[in-house]
Design a protein with these regions (language model features):
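Short acidic/glycine-enriched loop/turn segments that link adjacent beta-strands
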Residues: 23-24, 61-64, 83-84
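Amphipathic, interaction-prone secondary-structure segments
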Residues: 48-76
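Negatively charged, low-complexity tracts enriched in Asp/Glu with abundant Ser/Thr
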Residues: 2-59
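Acidic, proline/glycine-rich low-complexity IDRs
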Residues: 1-10, 50, 55-57, 93, ...
Length: 117
């Protein structure tokens, strides 16, 4: 397979419809068209765009959960099929600043202006 074919099978960009920081839940809610069976085609470009290292990938019948590292902060990227819900979360209140910064990296990925808070 040549590199052109590889690029076509693994998109470099993603489109996010909406992203919202939830300070109380220590998370970023993401609304996008995500295919559960091809989650990596959404998650890998998102991790690259956020300059995150993928440390671990877990999945089950209706859920994906990836452990991400951003400059020493551990974050979880979640996607649940039945609720069609995606979010990035931290368990550490101090990392809310990291989520706030990641929102600045997500904004260029938004499909329409005004789709973030």
């Amino acid at each position: 397979m040549d590199s052109g074919s590889l690029e076509k099978s693994m998109p470099n960009t993603i489109s996010i419809k909406e992203a919202r920081l939830d300070n109380d839940a220590l998370s970023i809610l993401i609304v996008a068209d995500i295919d559960f069976e091809r989650f990596e085609e959404f998650a890998e470009p998102l991790a690259r765009a956020l300059d995150c290292e993928v440390r671990e990938r877990q999945w089950g019948a209706d859920r994906h959960q990836w452990l991400l590292n951003f400059e020493g902060s551990q974050l979880w990227l979640h996607y649940e099929f039945y609720g069609d819900i995606c979010w990035i979360a931290t368990e550490t209140k101090a990392d809310i600043e990291v989520l706030d910064y990641l929102m600045t990296l997500i904004r260029p990925l938004l499909m329409a202006k005004g789709s973030y808070e």
